[in-house]
Structure formats: C-alpha cells, structure tokens
C-alpha cells in the first residue's frame, strides 16, 4: 500500500515541480515499505542527494503524502542506498562481459597514462584497421576540482557528480548538457570521465567529438571494418560525445548512432552528450534521436553570473601564480560577461601585458590591455538594446517601460530590464533610472533586489531572466 502511495505522490510532485528539478532529485529516489506499511524508506544514490532532498523537498513530500493518506501516515526515512540487490555502480564499470552480442567486450583495455591538459581537447584521428587500442582522449586537467561552480552551472555540476558516483543510474542516462560556447560543458564531461577512471582505472571510458564518430564510421565503411566499428563503440563503459549538433543532416551517421545509443542503454552503459542548444531545437536531427536524448536528464548551462566570473578569474590567476586584486577581478568580470572562454582569454591578455611591461595589475593596466574588448562590449550591450529585447520578449512597447504605469504586466518587465541593465552595463544606478523615464536610483535598487528575490523563488521568472540574458550576451 505504501509503495502505491509513493507512486501517487510522484505523480503530484511531477506536476508541481519544474521537470529538471523533478528528474534530477525526485525521480532517482527508490522506495521500500516495511511489511506492516508503517515505515516508508526513500533511498537516494548518494549523500549529496540525501542532503539536498532533505533540505529542499522532504517537507513537501511529507505534506503530499499526508494529503493522500486517509489513515496514519507511514514514518518517512531518507537514506543512501538502493532497493536492488546490488548497487548499479558496482557492476556497470567493473570490466565484466555481457552475454549480449552488443555488450562490452570481455577484456577492457587498461586506462591510459595521465596526460597534461591540451589546448584542444578534441581527439586526434585513430585507425579502425586491425585491433584498435582503447584510448580515453580525456583531458586530465578538466576535473571537478578545477571546475568553478556558481548559480548558473550548479545543477549541471551536481548532475555530473551524480553520474560520476553512480554511472548509468535511473534518470541520469543519458546525461545531456546544453548551452552556448565556452560555458563549461566539455569541462564537466571530461570531469565525469576522469572521475570514473579514478574510481576504476579499468573502466573503458571514451571521449570524442561527434565529427570524430562520423569520420570513424566513414573510414570503417571504406575499409570494410564496420563490424569492428560497431563492436568498439558498443563495448565502452561510458561514451562521451561532444557537440552532437554536428550529427544534423548526416542521415547514415544518425542511423548508426541511434543503434549504438540503444545498445549502450540496454546494457547499462553510461552516455554523456553535449549540444550547443536544446536538442529539440536542432534542425536536421531525427525525431527519434531527439526523443531518446530526453530519456535521461537534460541540463542547461547558462552564462556565469558576476560572482562566478570573479571566482573563475581568481582561480585562473592563482593557477598562473599571478596576484589579481579583487577590484581588478570585478572590473574584468563586469565587462566580459558572455562565457568562460572569453573571460579566460581576457585574463591571459592582462597577464601577458603584465609580463611584457613588468607593471603591477591595476585598473589602468587592465583598461589598456583590454581596451578593444571593453569598447566592443560597450557597443554590443546598451540600455536601449536591453529595453528593446525585454519589450519584445514580454510583448509590450518600449514606451511602457518608460511610462509611470504600475500594472504587473508592465512593472515586472521594467524591473527585469533594470536588473539586466545593472548586470550587463557599466552604468550607475542613477543613470539607469534616468534611462527608465527619469526614475531615481532607489527605484532601480528596489527593482534589482526584487528580481533577485523572484528568481530564487519563482522558476518562471528565473527562466525568463536567463532567456533574456542568453539573448543579450550571445
């Protein structure tokens, strides 16, 4: 009876919660009821999930169960564990063979020797002729410890950690990370692969760019080694494929990947994918692939917010053994907003300027080193542009944003536009207020605080804000 109660509870929670929250935190929970139905134990895959669910969702779970139960409510427990006889992670990556013809090969190749980080993480061409040696192609510099977490990427990082600790677990296979360039998708993908190999050096983990998969398939067809191609890609413990948008329009490659995808999932092998946008928005991808990509967890990665950009700069400066003052880090972060790659590029220019001139890092030096980038950013994002984009997004007129109207349909977009102006431009609060119909700085400050509060409590406002941020910085 308690298990039936839990299924009804799941249905309610799925309706209430945003899909990414439900799929990430609630769906992976497994339930076990005591013989007398007096106790209901929820099993989470690791301690991180236990702590998160207890902090964010357990009270609501208890409320829903109470609303649905006519009699005494079973005692609710939350623990790390599984209802299955063995933990999935113990069998997915132990190098064992499978009875299926599409399953893992009987002898996995040894993990490659550690390599130093490379400037280009894409693998070099490999031959499919003869016995193919397993090479992970992982960048050993991309780990969880070198990844800077912030609000914009915290959910994606947590999902990646989950996969690294519990590969091929329910609700996380495949794991798909999507977003614009330079936001850390590839870093997280490599971090999972490196952690899987750290936990089990015999795991067969393979990273490659989607174009490499296509090139290997073409080579296999030309050399009549397509069966070996299939055996190799279907024998891995974890397959990590970057930039799947490049499969678009390549029908034969999509056909082969479709069958590889199915074989891996059927045999409990982990798949991790990245894409530059939500796959359903990619023209030229077959609908059946788009559907399968949604079987697991799809997690967006957004441009980093100011605090995360500062943290990234400080960490990279520390790695380069350069002292970056806080005011200098904030100055750079306020002006380079689009992605991590551009942020790191700006810091490299500053460091090069320091080493060439022998000067100390200060605001003046940064202005000189980044003068063309700063000028470009200033031209790209203006308050006028923000007002235009926000008005189009909310389907109102720009004059409405400048008017004294206080109806919610106008006031809320105006507050969002003010908050974006503060985050994306170097204008002061009084200057922003002046551009919004002559309002004073206290109105702008209130708008910024209100939007921050709403983003934390209202998923719809958070989605609107991030959509606008992505549009303005892309």
From Swiss-Prot:
Region Domain III, AAA+ region, residue ranges: 137-354
Low complexity bias: start-end ranges: 96-113
Location(s), subcellular: Cytoplasm
The keyword Nucleotide-binding is assigned to this record: yes
GO molecular function: ATP binding; ATP hydrolysis activity; DNA replication origin binding; lipid binding
Residue sites binding ATP per the record: 182, 184-186
Family the entry assigns: Belongs to the DnaA family.
UniProt name for this protein: Chromosomal replication initiator protein DnaA
Organism expressing this protein natively: Alcanivorax borkumensis (strain ATCC 700651 / DSM 11573 / NCIMB 13689 / SK2)
Gene: dnaA
